[in-house]
Amino acid sequence: MARACEVFSVRKKYADDVFQWQEGLVQFTPDDDVSSVVAPGASEPGTLTEPRDFNLMFKTIVGALGGEDDAAFLRPETAQGIFVNFKNVVDSTRVKIPFGVAQVGKSFRNEITPRNFTFRSREFEQMEIEFFCHPDASREWYQYWRDRRFQWYVDLGLAGDRLRLRDHEADELSHYSTGTGDIEYAFPFLPPGEFGELEGIAHRGDFDLRSHMEGKLDPNTNPLQLEVDGNGQPKWRGSGKDLTYRDESTNDRFVPHVIEPSAGLSRGTLALLCEAYTPDDRPSKVFMKFNPRIAPIKAAIFP
């Protein structure tokens, strides 16, 4: 509460009247008291607008003559296409768990305040791996991918005190995550002590596959059991398809857990360029000292 009062310039004795608290989150009460609050970065009250919803997905109409019935949304991440096709991958390739599906592609987010270009843009290149594993082994696989992805950046030349691996606190975790670690880099244009995120490794559990199934697996009978709400309607809006996996060796059927390394391609490229940039006293003034694994020219002989 003290932090909220400080940020919004509210006296502590008025905090209970101005704020509402729910599961560790602070919300303004929707009344006239908000107009007397000084917003962050403002010098006087009255700058806060009424709360309203924002759609963070880009809506478009498919077809030159399409109407609202032809509405579609640009994907905000590449991950969901992998989850939707999970069953197709298993059935067509006969792959066995644990296995992963990797993808590079464009994603689109209707950012409210796009800024800093590479770090907050409405269109960006995303690299993701969805690694499917048995629930009992998911924590070990999370640690594996967390450490392996960090080492990957080290092997490419990002090392020293400019690169770090930071685990999320409990109040930072996304709604689908049971554990997340961020690989961060101290870009030279950031203030001292600040880092920019390169990649996040998240333990997504079975959240995505269960959401797409529109139900939950009954461990006693194995078939998909549809969950309903108090009105008898489906509780989850999914496909209704069975996305469980059966281990042929044990006949164990389960919903796989997912470990997701997710990175911005342009962020990693920018970090490698910053790391390679080397001032020089010679006439060239500067040269790029790339790691040999990514150097376009491995060696040269000059007269």
Predicted regions and their residues:
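TRNA-recognition modules of translation machinery and tRNA-sensing kinases, especially anticodon-binding
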Residues: 1-303
